[in-house]
């Protein structure tokens, strides 16, 4: 009889641990994608003061050879925003691309070059990732 009571008590105690696991679990963010390709949204990544660094429309993002994320926006206060992988703003530049829409990156030698397509000005610009 003691054995039966021990087993019942063990089951009840262990079941409680599984319930507590979900109670104290932290939300890891929304998951997007399908099949075996999924992405988790990090809502704290890259949060900036929109009065200082506004983003009108994010038309393109690329990763440079140093692992930094380059974001292109048609906001002429800062057409290019460069982030670390962790979401910290490293630099920003560009005020002359009102129709910034396409962004491609190409490594030439030891340097990355950005190709920015501006659909409003009907131009394609080649720059360094410092805007020169």
Where are these regions (language model features)?
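Eukaryotic scaffold repeat domains enriched in small/polar residues
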Residues: 13-14, 19, 26-132
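N-terminal secretory signal peptides and thylakoid transit peptides that target proteins
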Residues: 1-14
């Amino acid at each position: 009889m003691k054995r039966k009571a021990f087993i019942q008590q063990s089951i009840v105690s262990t079941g409680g641990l599984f319930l507590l696991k979900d109670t104290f679990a932290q939300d890891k963010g929304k998951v997007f994608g399908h099949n075996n390709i999924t992405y988790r949204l990090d809502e704290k990544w890259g949060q900036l003061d929109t009065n200082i660094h506004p983003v009108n429309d994010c038309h393109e993002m690329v990763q440079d050879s140093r692992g930094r994320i380059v974001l292109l926006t048609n906001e002429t206060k800062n057409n290019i925003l460069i982030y670390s992988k962790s979401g910290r703003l490293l630099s920003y530049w560009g005020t002359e691309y009102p129709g910034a829409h396409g962004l491609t990156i190409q490594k030439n030698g030891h340097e990355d070059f950005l190709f920015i397509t501006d659909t409003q000005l009907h131009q394609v610009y080649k720059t360094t990732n410092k805007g020169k």
